[in-house]
Amino acid sequence: MAKQTFLKGTLILIAAGMVTRMLGFVNRVVIARFIGEEGVGLYMMAAPTFFLATTLTQFGLPVAISKLVAEASARGDHQKTKNILVMSLTITGVLSLIFTPLFLFFAPVMAETMLTDKRTLYPLLAITPVVPIIAISSVLRGYFQGKQNMNPLAMSQVLEQVVRISLVAVCTTIFLPYGIEYAAAGAMLSSVAGELASLLYLFVCFKYKKTIKIRKHFLQSIKNGKQTFTQLMSVSLPTTGSRFIGNLSWFFEPIVVAQSLAIAGVATVAATKQYGELTGFAMTLLTLPSFITYSLSTALVPAISEGMEQKKLQVVEYRLEQAMRLCLLSGGISVVILFVFADELMRVMYGSSGAAVFIKVMAPFFLLYYFQGPLQAVLQALNLAGAAMMNSLIGALVKTGLIFVLATRPSLGIMGAALAIVTGMVLVTLLHAATVSKVLPISIKIKEYALSFAVIVICGFISSAIKQYISFGASEAVNLAGWIAASAAIYMILLLVFRLIKKDELRRIPIIGRLIIR
């Protein structure tokens, strides 16, 4: 099975992540165009419940599988790899059988009582079949990740989004005549189809690239898998706890926001619309660049686990430094584009600039958010998943408490929820960094970081001037594309001028690297 280096694997995932995020963004835009702000609100209010259910079913196993498979591969232990897969499939299979019927049974209660809008029942029911699908695909993803073969992961992500986009317009159009809630359910069904296509692709890749036979002595592997089960649980339990806390917080978020806005005197329909603008429009744009940090997180777990298994601490520290540097540089241009062109992005993408104010307030804080995923991946690889879980718990409690405190104030309303969300994100990132620094030295080069922030500010001012004085075409979409391209070029030039990135580093970027140097 082809194994990539840390950098190559990361670049493959970043390329796939860029494509899938763009496709996913198109998917969100299509949904917004077909079912409107109210429909997006119903869709987004049901989504946290879906992620909570899948988190419980996955049980944190993708990270655990990745870590343990990487360690087993470093030792050349193929039998251990088989035991890991057998136990993981058994665990996720049992959990799927438990949580799928429970999800169906409690969906009406969640819709009417907790989410305060009974129309969310239909999107909740539509996503139920995805639970066992994601449970199985997560095991295969963890396996390929642990083998440091990122190609199947990358292709499956792209395939999932292609299928979603291909079906979302059809599904929403078919169900829209029956009501906005049915259209939201149709959008959810397209997501289920995408996940199924992704699973089938991963299964085919595994079947033709595997070096072990899973079905042979399957039951015997389960009986003799006590040690493997314990090792999986030592990583998966705190990882599940961390994700469960995050998803539970997200699950309660629309509930707390709805109740808080009700106290502030906002009607139910208006609250649903405002929450749709914040989470469906603004948060979608703000989290768009996180595909880079997600790719880093995916590649970091096996790379650091392998380094620790082989006791190569210098390699581990170097990987961490690489990851933090890439987070800062990629996050910087993302913040500039989101902050400066917030109104234009919203109008071009959604036909309304109502949520632009959220982006302008939240974008600067999201620079720290882009560090959160890689830092958590490092903690998990260092057997500090429990510490990551506690950090997530603290952040979730602070966020939820602040939502109630701030969103109940009529002067703030939904903006109070936005401020609470970024406060929780920043807090968790800082706690993760503090925890990692106790085990591994995080070399903070003050001059380099100061120059990086200076480049971000300078690029922001230049981008604002470009928007004000330069026109690239008659339509706003053409102007926006020109402004973003110019801003990215200026940012790259500033990085080279201040020597924050070197020419030989640019050459390593596939295809575009050599074009930039020329």
UniProtKB/Swiss-Prot annotation:
Its main location: membrane. Coiled coil: none annotated. GO terms for cellular component: plasma membrane. Keywords: Cell membrane, Membrane, Sporulation, Transmembrane, Transmembrane helix. The chain crosses the membrane at residues 6-26, 45-65, 91-111, 120-140, 165-185, 186-206, 250-270, 281-301, 326-346, 348-368, 387-407, 411-431, 446-466, 478-498. It is a multi-pass membrane protein. It is found in: Cell membrane. CDD domains: MATE_SpoVB_like. One of its GO terms (biological process) is sporulation resulting in formation of a cellular spore. Signal peptide: none annotated. Belongs to the polysaccharide synthase family. NCBIfam families: spore_V_B. This is Stage V sporulation protein B. The lineage of its organism: Bacteria, Bacillati, Bacillota, Bacilli, Bacillales.
